[in-house]
Each structure stands twice: as C-alpha cells, then as structure tokens.
Design a protein with these regions (language model features):
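N-terminal secretory signal peptides
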Residues: 1-18, 26-34
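Metal-dependent phosphoester/phosphodiester hydrolase catalytic core
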Residues: 20, 25, 41-403
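C-terminal motif of bacterial Sec signal peptides marking the signal peptidase cleavage site
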Residues: 37-38
C-alpha cells in the first residue's frame, strides 16, 4: 500500500476543509477522493489526492511523469517498451488515445473494443499508474465539440475503458474533467485534466483558407513552406472551450495546495498561428485562464499537450507573472512531418514517434526549489528535445504577490 488517509489530512480545499472519503483499492496506489467543499458547481468532478509510491532511500528523490497522445489502435505500438523502460511514476494520456472517428453507436463501441485489444498498450496500463483525458478522436470524431451527437455515450465508453467506478463524477458531469494530487518527497504535484471537447463551441473556419486537405498537403510538400490550417480565432464573448460549470471547477482546482501544477491540455495551449486546433482559436478563453492563474496566485503551472503529431516546447510570456510553458508530445503512433507555424515555439520540432518525460526533483538537498526536467524522447527512449525549468522561475514576482 502507498499510504493511508492520514498521509494527506493536511490537504485542504478552497473552503479550508478536507473531507476524507473511502479508500479506493488498487495494487499500485491508494487514491482518496476529495470533494471540493463549497465549490460553486452543483455537481463537480472530484479532485483525487494520491500518495506517490514510497521512494527507496538509495533511489533518486524525484517524481517522474511520462506523457503522450495520438495512438491509433490499428497500428503497431512498439513505443510502450521504451516508455516502460523509463519507469515513470505516472503516465498521462493526453487524448486521441484511440481513433474512433464514429458517426454511429455501433462504430463508436467497436473502436473502443479495438482499443481494449491493443495488448502492448493494455499491458503498460496494467503495470503503470496512469490517468487520461480525451481529445477529438476518442471523444468521437475529427475536430468535434459540444455538438457531437454521441457525446453522452462516448462519456460512458471512456469511463468504462478507463476503469471509472459506477459512481464516478466523470460519468455524470458535463464532461470528463478531473484533477489529481500526488505526494513525493514531501512535495505535492497536481495534475489537472480539463475536458476541451464536451462543451467546446464549434470551430470557426476561414472559407478562403479551407480547401481540399489533400491539395493543401500537396502544396506544402511541393513548396517546402509551412502548412497553415484553416481555423481562425473566435472572439465572440460566448465562444467557449470549457463551459461555465467547468470554469468554476477549474478555479477551485487552482486553489488546491500544490507545489507544481501540470495542466494536461488535449490541444496546445501556448502555440500561436498554426491555424489548427488549440487555445489560440479561443483567445478570450486563453486570456481568461491566464487571468485565473493570476487571481488564484497559482504558481508552478506548466502545460502538457498533445494533438499535433509532433513534439515541441512553446511558451507564453505573461506580464507581471511568469512564463507559461507548454510541452507538446504527439504522437505515439502518428507523425506529421510538414512544418507548421507557431510564433511561440521555443525548441526544435520533433517530427517522429515520441513521448514526453518530466522529472520533478529538488534542485539541491535541503533547498525549497524544485527542478523540472523535460525530455521529448523517440521510440527508443532517446531524448531529442530537452528543457529545464525551476520552480523559482514559475512564481509571481514579489511585487505582484503583494500588489
């Protein structure tokens, strides 16, 4: 067992109280469901506080998170060997964990059955603690959002496939958003998984840009120029990614005590100018999240994202705040090798099969600061893109804190 209820009794919600619920049995960990007392939502998804596996005294003092996205169930998936060899304490599935692309119930059910039959993936799941969110293809179909007609069925199929109990809030909320907290070497690492599909407003496409997809690809390959998508920012006040209920939930999550906060976004948060899916298509929503991070004084926020079929690091500089970094890892089976614009790109683009690693560890023994080591790795586990951050660099300036 990884711990008991008393291991986390010091954690409090936004209302200053921690309601301890029943232990959920598991061979790898002991999760504890923590309802957000006083949350503005009527039926919020719960946060889950989970004691990380005790680390041997001779082992490195770190918490290792692996992450990835975009695994087509009809293709070989050899990458799980390398991910397993990295021995992560947690794997975060960032969406497109299967490709349903379904317009009818029978197809949707069949695709989930195919996903459950991918033995390398399922064997990895049996051996490694993991959490998951969906993107469009496992939600239902390409680029779908709130109008997808099978979303309630998809919600239940997702919960079945990812072993959510019958009374899980993910089965009854307006989406599958969920949050977790892990404790390692006396520090708290929070993983927040917003649902960017269930309530998302229909995307806005520029008719002058939207042409035959095959023709766009051919032009890009022949010209050697970056290929920009056809989606444009929707600046209408009502356009949303999350919906108001989920926004209230997210605010509560950002107030939960944590040292490092990883927001698992199924689409890129920091990228700008690609013309494909991302928070950039909803500039009011992205600005709202930046402001929410500021008003809740949530420090140590970093984004993990998927979707793009390549890997890279991006960031947004926030006036009066700290840089918001976005580590994109995609895909586990899918590769896009045509250059795509991104004004906020901060690394080389890794256009090959990949997964991400993040080691959270003390900078030096006895100090308060933490080091966040990112590595975007190939199918053999070799790091191709790396980035190192410190928790001290993910904090508000002192004058901002006291303003």
């Amino acid at each position: 067992m990884a711990g008991d209820v008393d291991d986390v009794k010091g954690l409090a919600d936004a209302g200053g109280r921690l309601t301890r619920r029943r232990l959920l049995a598991g061979s790898l960990a002991v999760p504890i469901a923590v309802p957000l007392v006083g949350c503005a939502t009527a039926d919020p998804a719960t946060a889950v506080v989970e004691q990380a596996t005790k680390v041997d005294a001779k082992a490195p003092r770190r918490f290792r998170i692996a992450f990835g996205s975009c695994a087509k169930q009809s293709k070989p998936q050899p990458i799980w060997r390398a991910i397993g060899a990295a021995k992560p304490d947690l794997f975060v599935f960032l969406g497109d964990n299967l490709y349903a692309d379904a317009r009818d119930e029978a197809t949707l059910r069949q695709r989930y059955a195919e996903f459950m039959a991918v033995e390398p993936l399922q064997a990895f799941r049996r051996s490694t603690r993991h959490v998951a969110i969906w993107d469009d293809h496992d939600f239902g179909d390409d680029d779908e959002g709130a109008d997808y007609p099978l979303k309630q069925l998809s919600q239940q199929l997702f919960c079945d496939a990812w072993n959510e109990p019958a009374d899980s809030p993910r089965r009854r909320a307006d989406g599958i958003y969920q949050s977790y907290v892990y404790e390692a070497f006396g520090r708290r690492i929070q993983v927040i998984l917003p649902d960017l599909r269930f309530n998302r407003t229909m995307l806005t496409a520029d008719p002058s840009l939207k042409s035959s997809y095959a023709a766009m690809v051919l032009r890009a390959k022949l010209s050697g120029q970056p290929m920009t998508g056809w989606y444009v920012p929707d600046t209408r006040p009502g356009a949303t990614l999350l919906g108001e209920t989920q926004w209230a939930w997210l605010e509560e999550q950002l107030r939960v005590p944590a040292d490092v906060r990883l927001i698992g976004s199924s689409v890129q948060f920091a990228a700008d100018g690609s013309g494909w899916e991302g928070w950039a298509n909803f500039p009011r929503e992205r600005a709202r999240l930046v402001e929410l991070i500021r008003t809740t004084r949530a420090e140590g926020v970093v984004f993990l994202s998927g979707d793009m079929h390549y890997a890279e690091m991006s960031s947004i500089d926030v006036a009066g705040g700290y840089p918001l970094w976005d580590a994109t890892s995609s895909g586990l089976t899918e590769v896009w090798d045509i250059p795509t614009p991104n004004r906020n790109r901060r690394s080389a683009v890794m256009a090959e099969l990949n997964f991400g690693l993040l080691d959270v560890e003390p900078v030096t023994e006895g100090e308060d600061d933490l080091r966040l080591r990112f590595a975007l790795c190939d199918v053999n586990g070799k790091a191709k893109v790396t980035k190192e951050l410190t928790l001290s660099g993910l904090r508000f300036p002192e004058k901002e804190k006291t303003a």
